[in-house]
């Protein structure tokens, strides 16, 4: 049977690379891979997965937009006897066959400790968060706050939905309210790059 790959978004270079890697491997193995882009819309992802199930796929690879919202559709796939692999983000409450992800809590904790070493304890810091409900957002936020709540002055936490353009806008707004900001922790590279554009030549 075919392999279905439901990806959270193809508007982010990381996930583009992820899907290209899957496509290259599928071609090498002679497997039929169907890639569907949820466009960061949890409801669309649910219908995408239900559609893949109706196409009688044998394997579902899922990269959730929202780790809770995707669960019922993934449970339907499991019930239909489809093997399920989650990638980069988890599916909450569903016993999938394989979960492939990095330790986002530990990664964020280490990054925040490094930031403290650069800007010093008690420095004013902002957090730019990922898409609400994504396990990566929750875990990276947890890792950041494990250190930041003890060692930094977190003056703003706002979401920019893992988007570069939103990261820039959010950062501009934060800087207007907090001109003496010393650091910013972003939940992904794209938002960080947007924040860098907003910061310009300021010493942050």
Where are each of the predicted segments found?
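A residue-level marker of the well-folded mature domains of exported/periplasmic proteins
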Residues: 1-204
């Amino acid at each position: 049977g075919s392999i279905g790959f439901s990806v959270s978004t193809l508007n982010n270079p990381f996930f583009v690379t992820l899907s290209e890697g899957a496509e290259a491997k599928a071609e090498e193995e002679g497997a039929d891979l169907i890639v569907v882009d949820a466009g960061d819309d949890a409801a669309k992802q649910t219908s995408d997965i239900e559609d893949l199930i109706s196409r009688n796929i044998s394997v579902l690879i899922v990269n959730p937009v929202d780790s809770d919202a995707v669960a019922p559709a993934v449970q339907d796939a499991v019930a239909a006897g489809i093997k399920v692999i989650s990638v980069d983000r988890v599916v909450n409450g569903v016993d999938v066959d394989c979960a492939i992800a990095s330790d986002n809590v530990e990664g964020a904790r280490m990054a925040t400790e490094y930031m403290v070493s650069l800007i010093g304890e008690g420095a004013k810091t902002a957090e730019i968060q990922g898409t609400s409900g994504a396990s990566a957002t929750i875990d990276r936020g947890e890792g950041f706050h494990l250190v930041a709540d003890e060692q930094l002055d977190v003056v703003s936490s706002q979401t920019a939905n893992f988007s570069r353009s939103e990261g820039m806008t959010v950062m501009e707004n934060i800087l207007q309210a907090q001109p003496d900001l010393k650091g910013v922790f972003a939940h992904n590279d794209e938002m960080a790059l947007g924040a860098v554009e907003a910061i310009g030549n300021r010493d942050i």
